[in-house]
């Protein structure tokens, strides 16, 4: 089916779709929590979503384009589900978050389809994929429009790979409950298969296609492949609920890697962002024979999951994401917080025990989601731990340096 026709079919004008901020029914406090986080962005007065300029720019979205779309959303006079929040326009129309970002993505998609130069076309497809992904953000369960735009993001991501100098393979993995899971294997032009491979574990509010930059700029130049798998309840893994066994899907993928001819299953490491670090560190404990090393940035493995004061300071969107992932969209806050406690790797009896898998943990000072103690706990639990402090200013440059250091460390551990 042609891309243009697909978008027309998916997005027939309709005003009865549930608005994103109404999907989780916990007690929204509707007040600015003044949260500033390198990996999650900023809370902004009168916005439901956290505005994540650093990561969106890092993925390749033009900062001016970000402001242009945000201004279109902010100016809308259409009906809102909450008149205090700018990004809550009801229905797929002008001013709606998903509509405006998807509209921007469709412009790049059209440009890609008309472009003759392969490199330019590939970049335009990537631009479209990034914008479609932001349209679906924060990817809450049951968000019909977001689920539709995620289809466009994946299609655009696959189209980009046809034009750019790397190989993308869509892999299917059989899961023990009878389901089939899909992941993307990115292979570099440097070296030859089987490749040393990094298994990517992203955050709770991201898609597996959001980490192309990590592969292109940090792993591919070292001849390292990247395998991406969505966290349970997100994207291609949406049929599975996130449980206390957070590494359930990734562990089965790891166990299947000896059957993948393009991957050197004896040289596999795991990289976790935010809650993805929970999965990554868990794998380091459960699969030490299969995992050469674990790296994580801004890990969420204990503190936020157990500290009630920190949880109370979380923005509404982030609590909604947690509730959505845990399948607790209707639960009272107290019940949700009690359940979150069970996801702590320390509560589960893992962190704090000695682990032979080398682990690197990067942290930002005054990170509201992941304090320095979180990273120190991971490093001190490993027989070969490395603590990586990351300065907050200049934010973009230091994020880049942290990724350079982390990718070099992973390469060294997979030699």
UniProtKB/Swiss-Prot annotation:
Q: Which domain of life is it from?
A: Bacteria
Q: What is this organism's lineage?
A: Bacteria, Pseudomonadati, Pseudomonadota, Gammaproteobacteria, Enterobacterales
The alphabetical list of record keywords is: Hydrolase, Serine esterase
The catalysed reaction is: a carboxylic ester + H2O = an alcohol + a carboxylate + H(+)
Name of the protein in its database record: Esterase FrsA
Job description of the protein: Catalyzes the hydrolysis of esters.
Query: Enzyme group, top EC level?
Result: hydrolase
Family according to the record: Belongs to the FrsA family.
Q: Does the keyword Transcription apply?
A: no
Does the UniProt entry include the keyword Hydrolase?
yes
**Enzyme Commission number:** 3.1.1.1
> What Gene3D superfamilies is this protein classified in?
alpha/beta hydrolase
GO molecular function annotations of the record: carboxylesterase activity
Q: Give a single Pfam family match.
A: FrsA-like
Q: Which InterPro entries match?
A: AB_hydrolase_fold, FrsA, FrsA-like, FrsA_esterase
What organism does this protein naturally occur in? Yersinia enterocolitica serotype O:8 / biotype 1B (strain NCTC 13174 / 8081)
